[in-house]
Amino acid sequence: MSIRYNSRLVAIDDDDESLQRVPQDLIESVGLSTLCFGSAEQFLESEARHKAACLIVDIRMPGMSGLELQAKLKAEGCRIPIIFITAHGDSEMRTLAMGDGAVEFLTKPFNDAVLLEVVHAALERSGND
């Protein structure tokens, strides 16, 4: 079976399932599809790494962090647009994430309209690759 890119699939990677639901419900409410993962390792082992049009990821997770995931994907030549959402961000983390090509770095709690705007910007970016 060949892997096909899906321009409407958003991957969400957060170790807290309850915090996956908020962006998942919001994104699905505008007709986009989502897949949720509880760790960077789960995302890397899935076909979503090749299919998703963008990735929403938490910075701090057990095992591989969101920043480490971003670096690994970049090193492998994967150009999936990444949106970071975190409750534990600081200016240094933001600088690292944005410097490595993140679409945005949002702090929890985030504004729903802002997240949707950023997701649409990420989807546009992925369509231009």
Q: Where are the language model's segments positioned?
A:
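Conserved acidic segment of CheY-like receiver
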Residues: 6-18, 23-27, 55
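Acidic, metal-coordinating helix/loop segments flanking the phosphotransfer/catalytic sites
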Residues: 36-54
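Acidic catalytic/metal-coordinating carboxylates
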Residues: 38-39, 65-68
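Receiver (REC) domain active-site loop signature in two-component systems and cognate sites
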Residues: 61
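Alpha4 helix (beta4-alpha4-beta5 surface) of REC/receiver domains from two-component response regulators
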Residues: 68, 89-104
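C-terminal output helix
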Residues: 92, 110-120
